[in-house]
């Protein structure tokens, strides 16, 4: 299992979640505004906007905040954000992809580079590590929506490539270009998903020792705490012992 999938629940452990909630809402609103600006402000006609709204709802972002972010896209004096992807190597040579929405490229690049350097890694050129990942569609449903067999059957019928089911829910993986089609088919059967978005999926993962794993987690936390960073993906795998320790904290 990819490192980021392993620790995404750890990142929301008690204390951290409350501390990040206001910052998270700001990031979600930024993605909604940018998505609405890039296409129509109607989520039924704009797949990216729909995905952004789904992500906001999954985090219990108030409806008023969502609507305000959409309306902001129509404002003539609204901020303009650039989409930037940074790629680099973290501790242990682990590949890391950082996606950002920024109104100041120089500031964000400097801050991201600093995080990599302080962790013992280094920021590289665009394209340096992305070839180690596949760009795919990911659709997440709550566990109670269906049992594993029903979800697998429906997903394959809809054209998906893979399904992972656990007590935490179902994750359906499909080709990037098939995301909207697969999502519609599964929504018709199971209702609205928790999440539907394009993601980076590691082709292979790297096992790291516990010391390196903790350094990588700190790097990811620092990156995700940055106001401009939207997503962080890495290709490492944590040991069961470290996962158990972190989950107990």
UniProtKB/Swiss-Prot annotation:
Organism listed in the record: Xanthobacter autotrophicus (strain ATCC BAA-1158 / Py2)
GO cellular component, one term: cytosol
Keyword entries, A-Z: Cytoplasm, DNA-binding, Transcription, Transcription regulation
Compartment(s) of residence: Cytoplasm
GO biological process, one term: regulation of DNA-templated transcription
Membership in a protein family: Belongs to the TACO1 family.
Keyword Chaperone found: no
UniProt protein name: Probable transcriptional regulatory protein Xaut_3062
Pfam family, any one: TACO1_YebC_N
């Amino acid at each position: 299992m990819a490192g980021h999938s392993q620790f995404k629940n750890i990142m929301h452990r008690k204390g951290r979640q409350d501390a990040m909630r206001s910052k998270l809402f700001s990031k979600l609103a930024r993605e909604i505004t940018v998505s609405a600006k890039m296409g129509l402000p109607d989520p039924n006609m704009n797949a990216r906007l729909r995905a952004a709204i789904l992500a906001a709802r999954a985090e219990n972002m108030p409806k008023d905040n969502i609507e305000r972010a959409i309306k902001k896209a129509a404002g003539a004096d609204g901020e303009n954000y650039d989409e930037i992807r940074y790629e680099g190597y973290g501790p242990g040579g682990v590949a890391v992809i950082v996606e950002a929405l920024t109104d100041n490229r120089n500031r964000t690049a400097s801050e991201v580079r600093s995080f990599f350097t302080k962790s013992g890694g280094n920021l590289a050129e665009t394209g340096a590590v992305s070839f180690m990942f596949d760009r795919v569609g990911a659709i997440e449903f709550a566990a109670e929506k269906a049992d594993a067999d029903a979800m697998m059957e429906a997903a394959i019928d809809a054209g998906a490539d893979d399904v992972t089911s656990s007590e935490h829910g179902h994750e359906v993986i499909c080709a990037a270009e098939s995301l909207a089609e697969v999502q519609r088919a599964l929504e018709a059967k199971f209702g609205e998903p928790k999440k539907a978005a394009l993601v980076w999926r590691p082709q292979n993962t790297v096992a790291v020792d516990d010391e390196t794993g903790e350094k990588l987690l700190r790097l990811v936390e620092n990156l995700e705490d940055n106001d401009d960073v939207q997503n962080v993906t890495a290709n490492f795998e944590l040991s069961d012992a470290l996962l158990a320790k972190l989950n107990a904290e």
